[in-house]
Amino acid sequence: MADGPHGAPWAFAREAKALSEHDEKDAAVRAALAVQGDSGVTPRHTLFYFYGEGDHDDLNEVARRAGFVTRGQDDVTVLETTIPVDEASFAPVSAMMQSWAAAFQLDYDGWECAVVTN
């Protein structure tokens, strides 16, 4: 408890936001980059991996329209682009990958990128 306006006690509570599995994996990749002196803010070659028996053709079409290079065969799709991977820049991209996986009934297995130090 802390004193609020006019000396009245206030209870402060922080809303806890549970991290998704992908949020945790994203943070782990960024932590590995940070250990190597990479803040993630410089755009770099980044790959995203999708697996499963869902609709890879539709994923490829949507991803190409969004500016990604796509490759893969059968039950594997890899999307490529050049982007920054710091948390603020990357969060919307990560959310988009997760929504594409759900929409096309695929497993989004995460991402990797080049290390860039300046």
Q: Which residues are covered by each model-predicted region?
A:
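Long, contiguous binding/interaction regions
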Residues: 1-118
